């Protein structure tokens, strides 16, 4: 478990693993070279994560993320060229991962170019899949990621802008195929 993601305290880098006995030696060797230990203040603060007040606050955050995710998934389902079959179901984290498909690509018009154009035209940042995919398979240029951590209003505005932008982008792609 990683406290930083589970309790919305990014940067703390505090967590633990439950592993089979057969992996303890190998994981310990890796861990010793990656981290020395979590700072004492982080360890002490982490204890607060399990009290009732923190649990209630965490539930409010989780509900906010659920509502933002629902807004994004709903709005994406209404955009021509983005069907639900092209959306990886969000399972952990606070991101939606979308595959535009080979049919919506042209040389020089993948998701890196799309995300750049979207940022320039609509002032909204999505992340191209090339940041997450193995470059040997060329899947990153047809995928992109949307964060829903910004809240419902932010999600609604971003999706309104994307709904306006994406059809124009597809026309540009088609004219360059």
Residue ranges and their predicted role:
Residues 3-4, 83-85, 130-135:
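Short, solvent-exposed loop/turn elements at beta->coil junctions and helix N-caps
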Residues 1-2, 88-89, 95-99, 128, ...:
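Short beta-strand segments
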Residues 117-126, 132-177:
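PLP-dependent enzyme catalytic core of the Aspartate aminotransferase-like
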Residues 1-66, 73-77, 164-166, 171-174:
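Conserved core segment of the aminotransferase class I/II
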């Amino acid at each position: 478990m990683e406290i930083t993601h589970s309790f919305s305290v990014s940067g703390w880098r505090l967590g633990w693993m439950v592993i089979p006995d057969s992996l303890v030696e190998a994981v310990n060797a890796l861990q010793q070279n990656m981290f020395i230990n979590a700072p004492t203040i982080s360890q002490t603060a982490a204890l607060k994560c399990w009290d009732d007040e923190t649990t209630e606050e965490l539930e409010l955050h989780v509900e906010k993320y659920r509502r933002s995710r629902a807004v994004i998934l709903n709005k994406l389902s209404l955009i021509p060229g983005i069907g639900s079959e092209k959306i990886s179901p969000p399972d952990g984290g606070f991101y939606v991962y979308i595959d535009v498909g080979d049919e919506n690509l042209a040389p020089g018009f993948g998701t890196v170019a799309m995300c750049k154009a979207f940022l320039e035209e609509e002032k909204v940042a999505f992340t191209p899949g090339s940041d997450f995919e193995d470059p040997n398979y060329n899947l990153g240029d047809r995928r992109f990621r949307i964060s829903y951590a910004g809240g419902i209003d932010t999600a609604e505005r971003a999706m309104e802008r994307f709904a306006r932008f994406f059809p124009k982008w597809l026309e540009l792609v088609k004219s360059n195929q």
